[in-house]
């Protein structure tokens, strides 16, 4: 059941990226802003995603979500870096290394290996990890709150609005259509649409700053998307019900 969901996620992510690159060519968007636009539409906040999946779908939903992010995180990281690559003298070896050492990717890969190999942890180690896991989501949400930059919302404009609601409304619609075309079951459809309704990752600001992109706009988009998610997410859940 995970493979069709992965197919939709990859298709929508790549399609959204291609659409943005086409718009960049048409409107001559500067690289410093294009990287922001791209991240705003394809990256996602893992902590909010895990919390949402745990509360709404339980263990089954978290398992599917974990499989999705394990394969999608490398893709969105590479695409995000490529969004800033023009004229940056980018080393593809450095891209591969930065993706390979991403702790979220490593954690997901280890989990997948254990899941498919049938190996089991010692009971004492398993209990310890369960305690850590119980703390991880609340701590992750605290980090999300701490990363919000409300002053950046003064950086208002059409780009802020378009990149906020493009992510929270247009991309989930695209995902829902993709689920219908791929014939996904209701459960997987809900997970995929919820995945694409998540706000962009707080780490997008760090990458934007590193490549000397429009970090002020990125901070504003992250903050507004995260705030508006509280309004759009219930609407999507109502629609999917």
Per-segment meaning from a language model:
Residues 1-241:
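Alpha-helical transmembrane segments of multi-pass small-molecule/ion transporters
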